[in-house]
């Protein structure tokens, strides 16, 4: 404990610490903290317990910490609320989510060192929100905050698994096996329109939960990390394993329970990942585009005993897929399952890449700027469409009337006008009558 406190107080120079400015506090209307209670009483009790001890270092260390806390919090001058405000602010600064400590200090000063006014003026620009973690479990998947306890994640996904099992039993469809689920973990998501790539970290957690026969639930935890894409038209020669990796982990709970384990506390064992290309399909056969997917590393487990590549056909449409993970992602569209939910507006999406594109709207950020008129856009596709105004480019040409359009939406709207044109009927002949 002493080591942790020493680390806290030595992380910044004393003149820059908020505690050095406590002399400017105005006396609050609340009751003052007496020396006989609170930190003073606690520290004195701890010090007295070491009076008869031969360990002089422990006594000196506690005395030093007592002087630091007493000098910082000044309980004879400040009220309980002021002391609590200082402790709350200090914890906020060292909690790991604050990315602009200097800005937070300035806002603390401008608020008159009043916690309520400080909270009202504080914006999300000064903090890093918890990352979202993409979790697979027995065919079910969803996004969770990285701070969410693992117990809550498993309980939530277990309910989804039970609901799907009941639904499949009513429909007479066999439930998905764990072997099929293991193949799904290799899916890599890449959005061709929003200008971002996903580097996926795959983590497998086996937790022993005491629910209905103490069965072991298998979790696949994939943490999303966004990295800028190469410039359009460029080709990256990097090995996929340099930017994408899988982390396999096995964690078993004691006595069949999980005591609030978070994702950060799970031990990791590094291993090779299984990264695939974006979803591709063909109405005829998957063999027609095998040569275009030679960079995929998910070919393991996809071949039969004689080396013949196995394909996966959708039972509801003619599409065929090379990889099971692509088929499972495609089937979500038939079932209208949208497991990736925006935490802001609760809107659901089929793929994680679609959710990432949508979340830019809530941030209000417009990182894509036109080099000519300096107008900013939230998505790269909107910037490309806008740049065609300056260049005069109209890449979408109607095959019937040869009219060109700048935007695909306008082009498709025009094509629907041709579909409404009816083919003139052939006049009847005397023989036909």
Swiss-Prot record:
GO molecular function, one term: RNA polymerase II cis-regulatory region sequence-specific DNA binding
Keyword entries, A-Z: Chromosome, DNA-binding, Metal-binding, Nucleus, Repeat, Telomere, Transcription, Transcription regulation, Zinc, Zinc-finger
Gene name, Swiss-Prot/TrEMBL: ZSCAN4
Location in the cell: Nucleus; Chromosome, Telomere
Taxonomic superkingdom: Eukaryota
GO terms under cellular component: chromosome, telomeric region; nucleus
PROSITE patterns: SCAN_BOX, ZINC_FINGER_C2H2_1, ZINC_FINGER_C2H2_2
Purpose: Embryonic stem (ES) cell-specific transcription factor required to regulate ES cell pluripotency. Binds telomeres and plays a key role in genomic stability in ES cells by regulating telomere elongation. Acts as an activator of spontaneous telomere sister chromatid exchange (T-SCE) and telomere elongation in undifferentiated ES cells.
GO process annotations (BP): telomere maintenance via telomere lengthening
Domain SCAN box: start-end pairs: 44-126
PANTHER family: KRUEPPEL-LIKE TRANSCRIPTION FACTOR, ZINC FINGER PROTEIN 384
Region (Disordered): 165-196, 275-301
Zn finger (C2H2-type) start-end: 312-334, 340-362, 368-390, 396-418
InterPro entries per record: SCAN_dom (IPR003309), SCAN_sf (IPR038269), Znf_C2H2_sf (IPR036236), Znf_C2H2_type (IPR013087)
Highest classification ranks of the organism: Eukaryota, Metazoa, Chordata, Craniata, Vertebrata
UniProt main location, coarse: nucleus
Protein name as catalogued: Zinc finger and SCAN domain-containing protein 4
Bias kind Polar residues: ranges: 165-185, 277-299
Organism: Pan paniscus (Pygmy chimpanzee)
């Amino acid at each position: 404990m002493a080591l942790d406190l020493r680390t806290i107080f030595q992380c910044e120079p004393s003149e820059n610490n908020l505690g050095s400015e406590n002399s400017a506090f105005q006396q609050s209307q609340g009751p003052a903290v007496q020396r006989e209670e609170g930190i003073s009483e606690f520290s004195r009790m701890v010090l007295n317990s070491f009076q008869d001890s031969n360990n002089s270092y422990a006594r000196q260390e506690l005395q030093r910490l007592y002087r630091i806390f007493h000098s910082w919090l000044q309980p004879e001058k400040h009220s309980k609320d002021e002391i609590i405000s200082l402790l709350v602010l200090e914890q906020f600064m060292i909690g790991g989510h604050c990315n602009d400590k200097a800005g937070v200090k300035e806002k603390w000063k401008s608020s008159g060192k009043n916690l309520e006014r400080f909270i009202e003026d504080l914006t999300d620009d000064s903090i890093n929100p918890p990352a979202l973690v993409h979790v697979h479990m027995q065919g079910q998947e969803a996004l969770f905050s990285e701070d969410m306890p693992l117990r809550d994640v498993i309980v939530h996904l277990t309910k989804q698994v039970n609901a799907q099992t009941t639904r499949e039993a009513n429909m007479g469809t066999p439930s998905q096996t764990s072997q099929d689920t293991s193949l799904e973990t290799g899916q890599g998501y890449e959005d061709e329109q929003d200008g971002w790539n996903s580097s996926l970290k795959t983590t497998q957690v086996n937790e022993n939960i005491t629910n209905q026969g103490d069965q072991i639930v298998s979790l696949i935890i994939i943490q999303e990390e966004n990295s800028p894409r190469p410039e359009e038209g460029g080709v990256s020669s990097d090995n996929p394993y340099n930017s994408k990796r899988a982390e396999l982990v096995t964690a078993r709970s004691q006595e069949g329970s999980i005591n609030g384990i978070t994702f950060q506390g799970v031990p990791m064992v590094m291993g090779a990942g299984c990264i695939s290309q974006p979803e591709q399909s063909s109405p005829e056969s998957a063999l027609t585009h095998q040569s275009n997917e030679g960079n995929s590393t998910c070919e393991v487990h996809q071949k039969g005993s004689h080396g013949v590549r196995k394909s996966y056909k959708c039972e509801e449409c003619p599409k065929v897929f090379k990889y099971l993970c692509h088929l499972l992602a495609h089937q979500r569209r038939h079932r209208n399952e949208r497991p990736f939910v925006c935490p802001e507006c609760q809107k659901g999406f089929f793929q994680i890449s679609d959710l990432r594109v949508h979340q830019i709207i809530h941030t209000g950020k417009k990182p894509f700027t036109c080099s000519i008129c300096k107008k900013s856009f939230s998505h790269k596709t909107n910037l490309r469409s806008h740049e065609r105004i300056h260049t005069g480019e109209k890449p979408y040409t109607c095959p019937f009337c040869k009219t060109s359009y700048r935007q695909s939406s306008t082009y498709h709207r025009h094509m629907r006008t041709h579909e409404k044109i009816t083919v003139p009927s052939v006049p009847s002949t005397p023989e036909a009558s």
